[in-house]
């Protein structure tokens, strides 16, 4: 399934000047911060740690991040997981089978879905494509402390501290009770 990202990219470029957008946004919507350290305002994602938007657009990062943003909107607040049992707070993905227990204690549901399905959920892959999903999974592994930051370009390295700080504030899971199968 393909998405049209043109208007989001255009809007992002139009207000990329820091004087136009009041420098950095102070608070991102809860549960809507992405692993790469971008924040949303008015449906457009802005990076908090760089003003080099031409480089970002040239490398495709802005388009990839907006694709993840639209996927979040499609899957809704619980990241594509549905209640498995009305008597408990266990949720399950009908496509990949991952189960999360005490789900209300997890803040960023799509991150948890991608992480615990090991980037293998076919329904998420339908939206993001294999390349973006693989990179998203690598970022969730980094945020969980499973691996080093998956920097592919030199300018990615400058995001490290901002990514960890943003994740701790907005998307750090309060509970990791997970079953797979």
Swiss-Prot record:
This is Uncharacterized protein ORF79.
């Amino acid at each position: 399934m393909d998405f049209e990202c043109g208007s989001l990219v255009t809007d992002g470029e139009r207000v990329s000047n820091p004087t136009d957008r009041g420098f950095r946004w102070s608070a991102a919507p809860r549960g809507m911060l992405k692993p790469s350290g971008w924040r949303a305002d008015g449906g457009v994602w802005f990076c908090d740690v760089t003003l080099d938007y031409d480089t970002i657009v040239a490398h495709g990062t802005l388009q990839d991040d907006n694709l993840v943003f639209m996927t979040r909107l499609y899957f809704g607040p619980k990241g594509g997981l549905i209640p498995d049992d009305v008597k408990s707070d266990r949720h399950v993905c009908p496509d990949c089978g991952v189960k999360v227990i005490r789900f209300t204690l997890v803040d960023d549901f799509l991150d948890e879905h991608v992480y615990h399905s090991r980037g293998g959920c076919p329904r998420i892959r339908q939206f993001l494509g294999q390349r973006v999903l693989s990179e998203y999974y690598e970022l969730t592994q980094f945020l969980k402390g499973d691996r080093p930051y998956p920097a592919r370009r030199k300018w990615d390295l400058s995001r490290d501290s901002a990514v960890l700080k943003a994740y701790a504030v907005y998307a750090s899971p309060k509970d990791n009770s997970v079953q797979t199968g």
